Design a protein with these regions (language model features):
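Well-ordered alpha/beta subsegment
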Residues: 101, 110-172
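Glycine-rich active-site loops that engage anionic ligands at enzyme catalytic sites
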Residues: 72-130
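Short, cysteine/histidine-rich loop/knuckle motifs that typically chelate Zn2+
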Residues: 37-40, 54-57
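Residues immediately within or flanking Cys/His clusters that coordinate Zn2+
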Residues: 32-35, 42, 49
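Residue-level marker of beta-strand positions
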Residues: 68-70, 138
Length: 172
């Protein structure tokens, strides 16, 4: 059965053939960030796939992760293609390196997840918050419900973590 919801007024549909993404967004709907872990090589992976990208095994389990990490990279969007994002310009799309599995299996490898920068209430980040975030900023996952069963993982500044004095930002 397909899963459906709404994010920023836009319809979201996860087809019933896409079991891996259905599972991921259902866990998010329970306010839980889970990733696939290979039962053979024990490496975790995102996005969800039908086989391990490291050893090609099809055996996996969903494992919870803490949901804290560091901004590895980001895009600051000033021209929204989707109309629902226009009131939130500029907004950040973050690539977050989770604390789990850093530099594994090789140096500079990691478990990374994309998502929008948000406020604690689940709304997209204000311009003031966007200006505070750069590479090295510590963030944690938050969830925005999209329907009865699914939620969108978002990133908020981790107020409990030590932050860089000046996170690196792309020059504009």
């Amino acid at each position: 059965m397909s899963l459906s919801g709404e994010y920023l007024g836009m319809p979201v549909l996860i087809d019933d053939l896409d079991k891996d993404n259905q599972a991921f967004y259902r866990y998010c709907g329970q306010n839980e960030l889970r990733v696939q872990e290979c039962l053979d090589c024990r490496l975790k992976r995102l996005p969800p796939t039908s086989a391990c990208p490291f050893c090609a095994s099809e055996r996996m389990e969903w494992r919870p992760v803490e949901g804290r990490g560091t901004v590895y990279s980001y895009g600051e969007v000033h021209h929204a293609i989707q109309g629902a994002f226009r009131p939130h310009l500029p907004y950040h799309l973050l690539l977050v390196e989770l604390d789990e599995q850093k530099d594994i299996p090789n140096p500079y490898d990691g478990l990374r997840l994309q998502g929008n920068l948000a406020e604690l209430d689940g709304s997209l980040a204000t311009k003031e918050t966007v200006k505070k975030v750069g590479i090295g900023t510590r963030v944690k996952v938050s969830f925005k419900q999209m329907g009865d069963e699914i939620a969108m993982p978002l990133w908020v500044i981790d107020q409990e973590a030590e932050q860089p004095t000046t996170p690196w930002r792309y020059p504009i």
